[in-house]
């Protein structure tokens, strides 16, 4: 009887942990998201920066470079408008939150999940189950381009902000993998769009690829293992208190703990590119 009771308690504890982690990853919103409550706190003596994107901006399953900017940019009020698992489709749903902040500068880092959703039907279904895309939507390059162009047009029409767009971070550290080849294609579009629309272009992908090319090392895991690596990363970080850098090293990578997200080196590259853009455009 005691053994059964112990097993039941263990199962319940594991379910509670799973539910908590699911909420942490899938439902969490940054504390400095531009919602109504936070908009009331804006310091009118500062400029407003809104960082718009997915988990690589959100920073709760990835290094939080936005928090670095909050502590380093004394003359900016910094909002984090990143949400885990978002695609260009979902940025369009949330774009009114960015507009409401009346930003002076907007950074956009989006596309990793748009690419990831095209890699196999299981990933597409996961984004559907999370409610990021409709059941009838199959993400593709043409939709990505149309969505991104619409995001830029809306922001240009409804804000007076400077807009800085970033090429995609590496998707795993095998640069010859199909995921990275697709991310190259998506990033080439972003670069061209920046030129066509007179936007600031931040070459994140170029910077990360150069780092990996200059520091080659054999890989322990493939891109196909991403989902399980992500689960392990979240457990290591939130259950055992390990840093994203620790998880990165454990998984045999240099820039990412799980093929999709950023450690402090990769996140630092994003932070520094944004800071450079601000300094050049004061």
Give each language-model segment a name.
Residues 2, 15-19, 30, 49, ...:
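Generic intrinsically disordered, low-complexity segments enriched for polar/acidic and small residues
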Residues 43, 71-72, 90-282:
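Alpha-helical cap/lid subdomain in secreted, periplasmic
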Residues 9-14:
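Core hydrophobic alpha-helical transmembrane segments of single-pass membrane proteins
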Residues 1-7:
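Feature marks short, highly hydrophobic, charge-poor N-terminal signal-anchor/signal peptide-like helices
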């Amino acid at each position: 009887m005691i053994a059964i009771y112990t097993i039941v308690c263990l199962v319940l504890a594991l379910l509670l942990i799973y539910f908590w982690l699911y909420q942490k990853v899938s439902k969490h919103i940054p504390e400095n998201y531009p919602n109504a409550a936070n908009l009331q706190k804006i310091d009118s003596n500062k400029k407003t920066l809104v960082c718009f994107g997915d988990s690589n901006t959100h920073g709760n399953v990835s290094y939080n470079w936005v928090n670095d900017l909050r502590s380093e940019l004394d003359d900016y009020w910094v909002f984090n408008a990143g949400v885990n698992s978002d695609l260009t489709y979902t940025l369009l749903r949330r774009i009114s939150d960015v507009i409401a902040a009346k930003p002076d500068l907007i950074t956009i880092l989006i596309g990793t999940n748009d690419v990831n959703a095209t890699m196999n039907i299981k990933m597409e279904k996961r984004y559907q189950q999370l409610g990021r895309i409709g059941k009838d939507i199959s993400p593709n390059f043409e939709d990505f381009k149309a969505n991104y162009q619409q995001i830029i047009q809306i922001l240009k029409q409804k804000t007076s902000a400077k807009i800085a767009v970033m090429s995609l971070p590496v998707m795993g550290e095998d640069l010859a993998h199909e995921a990275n080849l697709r991310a190259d294609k998506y990033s080439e579009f972003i670069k061209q769009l920046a030129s066509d629309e007179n936007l600031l272009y931040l070459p994140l992908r170029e910077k990360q690829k150069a780092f990996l090319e200059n520091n080659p090392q054999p890989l322990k895991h493939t891109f196909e293992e991403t989902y399980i690596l992500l689960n392990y990363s979240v457990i290591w970080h939130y259950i055992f208190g390990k840093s994203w850098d620790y998880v990165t090293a454990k998984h045999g990578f240099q820039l990412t703990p799980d093929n999709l997200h950023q450690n402090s080196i990769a996140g630092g590259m994003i932070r520094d590119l944004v800071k450079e853009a601000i300094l050049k455009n004061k």
